[in-house]
Amino acid sequence: MSLLFLDTFAGISGDMFLGLLVDLGVPLPSIQEGLDRLPVTGYQLHQQRTERQHVAACKIIVEHEEQHHHRTWRDIDRMLAESSLKPTVVDLARRIFRRIGEAEAKIHGRALDEVHFHEVGAIDSIVDIVGAAVGLDYLHPDRIVCAPLPLTRGTVHCAHGSFPLPAPATLEILRGLPTVGDTAEVELVTPTGAAIAAETAEFGDLPAMTLERVGYGAGDRQLSDRPNLLRGLLGTADDPWEGETDRITILECHLDDANPEWLGALMEHLLEEGALDVAFAPLQMKKNRPGVHLTVLAPQDKTVALARRILRESTAGGLRYQEATRFKLRRQIERLTTPLGEVHIKLFYEGDKLLRLAPEFDSCQKLAQSSGLPLPEIYRLAEQTAYDFFRKKG
């Protein structure tokens, strides 16, 4: 499994990430070819060898004539939809833009469609975000891990004036993700950089890996206390996971005053809304009240809808959420014939290796009802049929 580790000792921005990808071996012409598929003109893209505190790095420079072009979320979404980019590239770029847009919408108290992108709607930010999606598609690491992002103090100047660091949009984007405090008084993590990391990486320490390449993407400033670089380590994970991974949101809250009948209905409604899993666990709460701990595993695009459902249909006054990477076994259903009829068997694979199998409950229950035999006996028959089938199959 190929692994990319983002060492964010000096933070992350869109242009630093793009420079890192090029320094790791992504050809700039390949990124340019992808950007040419957008209905955006009037800019030139260059790479430059530079150094930060005597460390050589790649700096990406975007030259353009555009002045303060404010694009809306609909403009960005339409631009991506009308492009001839690969669907996977469009999907990642859209998720990065949307994450920034949702942060801006929350800060300004507006709907997403009413948000005007200022800095992020400019040509150079469009190049950074779409270029990052194109470059990652070329590099195609199986897994990306990012170190916790450094949050600094000071002020930053933007279209709405001066704001204290960390920038409000950056904080919204990084909700639920690991960060560390930093004594620098300059912006190290930009909203674009934060959104790229949040949408592409899991967060943690450097995993065990066989290192193959190291790249450096340069930021604009010369920092006094460290090289202003985003460092990337590309290699192979020493203990590769050959199954699947995805990103989910975990929603949680404690309830001590909910009618149990409502909770049963809430679980049904959450699953109908698209939750991957819903669980209740008993706990003892303040004032010695018995309560329940609600946990919901949500696809990222269903997070807000499921959170709204919880808050509307339970007694919760708030809830916690965090994003997580999920390791998954690939699932497959095999239909096998037993002396009593057809039964469905669930197969679980890591990569191409079959790890286990299990009879599917509904089909076993149907056979138990039609045959009059106990359900455990049907399970044993289904398991034996499956083991015999796969033993012969090899």
Swiss-Prot record:
The keyword Acetylation appears for this protein: no
Entry keyword annotation includes Manganese: no
Domain of life from the UniProt record: Bacteria
Molecular function terms, GO-annotated: lyase activity; nickel cation binding
Pfam families linked: Ni_insertion
InterPro entries listed in its UniProt record: Ni_insertion (IPR002822)
Keywords recorded for this protein, A-Z: Nickel
Family according to the record: Belongs to the LarC family.
NCBIfam families membership: nickel pincer cofactor biosynthesis protein LarC (TIGR00299)
Protein name: Putative nickel insertion protein
